[in-house]
Design a protein with these regions (language model features):
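N-terminal extracellular ligand-recognition/capping segment immediately after the signal peptide
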Residues: 123, 127-184, 192, 213-232, ...
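Acidic Gly/Asp/Thr-rich repetitive segments characteristic of extracellular carbohydrate-active
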Residues: 97, 109-143, 193-203
Length: 655
């Protein structure tokens, strides 16, 4: 068996036994036989080369070198791959950011650094949030938090702000302003007529516009003769084809018109919701303007107003100072508004007569729904509006201040406190239906015709299925306070019409009033309550029950009264009052119980009683003509002083 020599390194000075292995210059040699001293390693007689390691090592070295080259190349590739991966990561990060931005459906105030702790001034963050939202067309959503209103923000996207806002005495007004995307102002020359089917300027097509020009001929009312320039104002909406949707408010006019806040009727809808507003009103005489709306197709909802004090007794403001003010736009709905005032009682408070929670000016087709004005704050004001609807509300005043056109509706609501619904100049079709009225401020009329420019309401007032409960009323107060309009230039005096269809009237205040010379028309059906008249009304009443007939001695010779198919009573608790019917008085098909005591001093009076049942003998006194036709008379009435008395279809004994 071969064994390694000792030492293994070959030397010619050593002798070697057979089969000994030595190493020389990296190779291994094995002795074939005994090797004497002095034999060279290259002598093949004695040595056999058994291991050429240098060649193998070289081969290995070359292979390793090649592999190192490959490794180096691979390391370079890895480095490149790392760089590529880093680049891809950066691209992916950019894509992620872009995708996140595209997927972002809303932003919050806190995204822009707002603390919302009620102490920190978050004005810059809030304004920045709205600027970003307006630019990117995304809404703002913020749940929770409190902020002081030291800012003014322009809003063009929807906002859900379920948080508290503290209005300060020096808060900018308005705090929020919902604006149109591309509102324009321009002038044009031409004519604007009432029945136009095309817009006077192509730029108005498909737009809402507030149009005005100066008209010196419209100096009316208290301003007449002062030289003050009155603006001829109209609010219009045109469809895409250019057809006029609403007629001009005033006379046809030709000249140069200014169109302000012209913007598309089809602009993107915006919703503003959720805010709770706290305000201490003790330092101010009105409510500050928190939100202004000047954008079509806007919805404002779920707003709670918590004033910490009542307004001063001398409070006075226009509707533009209201908590929410809608101006120069169309199709706006305001809903679920609560005005909670814990420091006052809405049944008695009158201090907030002119401090509006909600105001409208120069609008078209707006709707207020579910507004709860608790604590004397339920006041709504409007100027120059076309088509207004109030529904499901609890209010103490609806002050339609100037210019009512189109349809004005108050329905399914309650009026209390001041309990007033005013109607200004205009030809609106006003409808009050399913409304409960509980007046607590006795000096106000429930329905008041304003005459701010000496022109009064000229439309039709419908009262349907309403109730009025006023147990402690004053007899001299008026339910409908009509005023006589005046003619001025081309503004004719148009007499309004009043239609009552279903009214429960538990009050002694005057029902039918007409100023002398106006001859206001009342058409009444389905009435029950105390019936009273004053002035010179023309009344046609049917299918009603009158507890007490009271004319207060104030009818004029122009009065015309037709009563048909009614029951006329006198309650034992009511004062003993005579009827003073002057003019034309017809009672037909009625049941008359202890009621008919009629006095008149007019020789021209004409009284006709036909188809009636008299249960108690009454004294009928007059100087004109009286006729009884086809009546059933249990106890014969006494007819005195009439210059002409006639009876037809009555039994001889009764005659």
């Amino acid at each position: 068996v071969p064994v390694f020599a000792d030492p293994p390194e070959w030397s010619s000075a050593n002798s070697y036994e057979p089969l000994e292995i030595v190493i020389h210059k990296g190779n291994s040699y094995t002795s074939k036989t005994f090797v004497p001293v002095g034999i060279d390693i290259s002598d093949p007689q004695y040595w056999a080369l058994t291991g050429n390691y240098n060649a193998q090592v070289e081969q290995y070295r070359q292979e390793v070198s090649a592999m190192q080259g490959q490794v180096t190349a691979m390391q370079g590739q890895v480095t490149q791959n790392k760089d590529d991966i880093a680049g891809l990561k950066r691209q992916a990060s950019d894509f992620d950011a872009e995708i996140a931005a595209r997927k972002k459906v809303y932003v919050t105030y806190k995204d822009f650094g707002a603390k919302l702790d009620g102490v920190t001034d978050d004005s810059a963050a809030i304004v920045a949030a709205h600027n970003y939202a307006n630019t990117n067309g995304i809404p703002i959503v913020q749940h929770g938090g409190k902020v002081k209103c030291n800012f003014q923000a322009e809003v063009k996207t929807s906002c859900l702000l379920d948080m508290e806002f503290v209005l300060l005495a020096n808060s900018p007004q308005p705090v929020y302003s919902i604006e149109a995307d591309d509102a324009q102002t321009f002038t044009f020359s031409g004519s604007v007529t009432a029945d136009s089917v095309t817009s006077p300027d192509a730029r108005l097509n498909g737009c809402f516009a507030m149009i005005q020009n100066e008209n010196d001929g419209w100096n009316l009312g208290a301003r007449e003769g002062t030289g003050t320039t009155i603006y001829h104002r109209e609010v219009k909406a045109y469809d895409k084809a250019g057809m006029l949707i609403t007629s001009p408010f005033y006379i046809p006019n030709t000249g140069t018109f200014t169109c302000s806040n012209v913007h598309s009727l089809w602009e993107r809808p915006v919703e503003f919701a959720g805010a709770t507003i706290t305000y201490d009103n003790s330092e101010q005489a009105n409510i500050p303007n928190f939100l202004r709306v000047r954008r079509n197709n806007t919805a404002v909802k779920d707003i709670t107003f918590n004033p910490l004090s009542v307004p001063p007794a001398a409070a006075s403001s226009l509707e533009s100072n209201g908590l929410i003010f809608v101006h120069a736009c169309a199709n706006v709905k305001v809903s679920n508004i609560s005005g909670n005032n814990n420091s006052s009682d809405n049944e008695t408070t009158t201090a907030s007569t002119y401090s509006y929670l909600l105001g409208f000016n120069s609008t078209f087709n707006c709707h207020v729904d579910n507004m709860l004005g608790v604590g004397g704050w339920g006041v709504v004001g409007s100027d120059w509006c076309d088509c207004m609807t109030y529904s499901n509300c609890v209010l103490n005043r609806v002050d339609n201040h100037f210019g009512a056109f189109g349809t004005y509706i108050l329905t399914n609501s309650k009026l209390t406190g001041i309990c007033a619904f005013t109607l200004p100049y205009g030809n609106a079709n006003a409808v009050i239906s399913n409304v409960d009225m509980f007046p607590r401020a006795k000096k106000y009329s429930c329905i008041d015709f304003r005459k701010d420019v000496n022109l009064a309401f000229q439309g039709t007032l419908h009262i349907n299925n309403c109730t009025l409960n006023e147990p402690n009323s004053i007899r001299g107060n008026i339910f409908i306070n009509a005023v006589k309009s005046v003619s001025s230039g081309s503004q004719p005096d148009v007499k309004p019409r009043i239609v009552i269809n279903g009214l429960y009237y538990n009050t002694t205040r005057q029902l039918c009033y007409s100023p002398a010379g106006m001859a206001l028309n009342y058409s009444i059906n389905g009435f029950e309550g105390n019936f009273s008249m004053w002035g010179a009304p023309n009344v046609k009443m049917s299918n009603s029950i009158c507890w007490n007939m009271d004319t207060n001695g104030l009818l004029t010779p122009e009065t015309i009264i037709h009563i048909d198919n009614c029951t006329l009573n006198k309650k034992e608790t009511t004062p003993s009052t005579d009827w003073f019917f002057t003019g034309e008085f017809i009672i037909a098909n009625c049941k008359i119980n202890n009621t008919f005591k009629c006095n008149t001093q007019d020789d021209q009076a004409k009284h006709l009683v036909t188809g009636c049942i008299f249960k108690n003998g009454e004294t009928v006194i007059g100087r004109g003509a009286v006729s009884f036709v086809g009546c059933v008379i249990d106890t014969v009435p006494t007819l005195t002083h009439y210059k002409s008395k006639s009876c037809f279809g009555i039994a001889d004994a009764e005659k």
